[in-house]
């Protein structure tokens, strides 16, 4: 009986790991809009300071379905020079010059999946190496820390008063590191990232057999830009996701977006074995807005109203001229 109860709790902890690359890390349909969420090497890659907010509600209509809320900030430490202006009060003003190679970023998230909740942050450092006038090689390292919480109030237990369940530490804190690398040119880009590199251990109680190890996750991204004319551009891209479970958690997003005057875009994405995704977005001055709808290809579509993802971003400052060729969502 004791082993049966332990099995129930174990299944509750890993119940969502059969889909979406074990879904121990947040999943995003609009990965092109903010690559920094999955790859720290993108921090400050375009020379701007950017704030991005993302809300994702998965399988709307199903109680305790996955949901994710994320806020990120990234910037480039551009080298500066000073110019003097003749005014009634003499001041020094800064203007960007060509040089800065360091990018910094921060990322806060709250990810809920059934009775499991992860809340944490990431602090990233990126180093960008210019190659010629329109190529860039980047590396990024991020320190992460998050709270893993287990809410058994949302679970159906055989015996909620059993001391075996009450011995579990339902809130634990896990530090870890993420790594990323990317290469960008005017017409294409590729990137690779690893998350949860240290495979943090979930110390769920005093007994050794209660401990569980988090999975390492791997992300491979790539995309290209094909300019049709001065108004239209086609942007195909792909995201490959896996984990230490390898082929059991292998998943791919294949996406094509069409841009009009860099102010509007729409696209279609296919997530293998999971969903078709419709997406659209627009830019107004320095503000960006995007929406994605996931139509499930599995039987869960009969019980939900699809998955919805909304993103908003704003860019501050003036990018150094040499980075403007990168600046496209």
Model-derived features: positions:
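Bacterial N-terminal signal peptides
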Residues: 8-15
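Bacterial N-terminal signal peptides that target proteins for export
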Residues: 1-8
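Subset of outer-membrane beta-barrel
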Residues: 23-329
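Sec/Tat signal peptide C-region and signal peptidase I cleavage site
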Residues: 17-22
